Amino acid sequence: MDILNLGSHRIGARFPEKGLRKGKNPAILLNDGELIEQLNLRTERAVLVGVYPNNRLSEYTPWPEPAFRPGTPDFGGQLGQYHRELNNEILPALIDEYALDTEKLAYGGYSLGGLAAT
């Protein structure tokens, strides 16, 4: 797995089992990027790219909100800032680094990471 630091985030990239194409490569971009490594995720043809969160309760929520349970952190509401960094710094660097095909790019995540991807 390739590990990069782009913007303020750690990025993990796992190449397809068939290797990178000579032309453009399809990709799946995932929030909670550490799951690619933890779950040993693989694909046959797409590059898996995971963005590791700095603070998922802040970065993956669209507005600030108090915690649901006492003793747990509040939701920070920094999704707009996270998306600006993703779109303006991280994604362009990944497109250049791995020749990603912007027409074949999926974006998703798990739980709050999925909310952030909508």
Which residues make up each language-model segment?
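Non-catalytic cap/lid and distal C-terminal segments of serine-dependent acyl enzymes
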Residues: 1-118
